[in-house]
């Protein structure tokens, strides 16, 4: 399909089958090596700055020491927040902990909750990667008892914290929150109830994470290409001209 053409979807694909979720240390080690390159070359971020990093480091330390269970709730206004947060957890939390004088006993990681539609449009590599990183799939459009039970067990007994977006999907609203689903609060309450029934002393912490994107320079070429695509699709033409090069972004979390 050539650039500027939009092909309608006329077929229905069968539901996908994912491997059982189980973290592979070799895969995680590989992702720690590749994540900085992907962030720079794939997502085009020039730098990542973390604010109040000692809070995240302290939350992970309390989880690994058995004092608390941890649920990470992150804003999802665009499409690359899960990748950005995964990079930060894999590659930066331990360094930030050392700078804050916090001793981290294990390599940080998090189990991300995702909809079944993500590996469907994400391609074969993502379908291979997500289960091996311990990601937790769930159906959004129908009742998924098996998926919810899997999440409930992970937050109560898993070896890593659980991460999800309270917005439920990409919100396309970086400056405001259009809505918040009940998932994060409900999962935290489930965990607290399970801990109480089991007589366990841990508390449940919710770590909120937000993102701010700062363009290093004006990056108008990508917007220009998207505008041309839309105009071609609806049969209009534009005489506007924009920059011809993309520029990296920086992000704060």
Residues covered by each model-derived region:
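Soluble catalytic domains of membrane acyltransferases
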Residues: 8-14, 23, 27-253
């Amino acid at each position: 399909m050539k650039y500027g053409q939009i092909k309608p979807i006329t077929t229905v694909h069968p539901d996908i089958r994912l491997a059982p979720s189980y973290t592979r240390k070799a895969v995680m080690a590989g992702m720690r090596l590749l994540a900085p390159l992907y962030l720079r070359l794939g997502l085009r971020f020039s730098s990542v700055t973390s604010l109040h990093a000692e809070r995240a480091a302290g939350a992970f330390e309390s989880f690994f020491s058995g004092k608390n269970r941890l649920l990470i709730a992150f804003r999802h206004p665009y499409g690359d927040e899960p990748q950005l947060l995964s990079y930060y957890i894999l590659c930066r939390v331990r360094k930030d902990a050392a700078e804050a004088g916090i001793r981290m006993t294990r390599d940080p990681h998090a189990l991300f909750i995702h909809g079944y539609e993500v590996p469907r449009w994400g391609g074969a590599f993502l379908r291979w990667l997500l289960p091996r990183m311990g990601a937790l799939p769930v159906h959004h459009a129908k009742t998924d008892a098996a998926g919810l039970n899997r999440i409930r067990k992970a937050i109560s007994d898993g070896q890593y914290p659980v991460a999800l977006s309270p917005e439920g999907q990409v919100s396309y609203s970086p400056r405001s929150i259009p809505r918040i689903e009940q998932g994060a609060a409900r999962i935290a309450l489930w965990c607290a109830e399970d801990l109480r029934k089991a007589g366990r002393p841990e508390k449940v912490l919710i770590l909120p994470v937000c993102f701010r994107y700062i363009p290093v320079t004006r990056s108008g070429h990508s917007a220009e290409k998207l505008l041309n695509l839309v105009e071609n699709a609806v049969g209009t033409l534009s005489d506007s001209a924009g920059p011809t090069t993309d520029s990296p972004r920086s992000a704060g979390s």
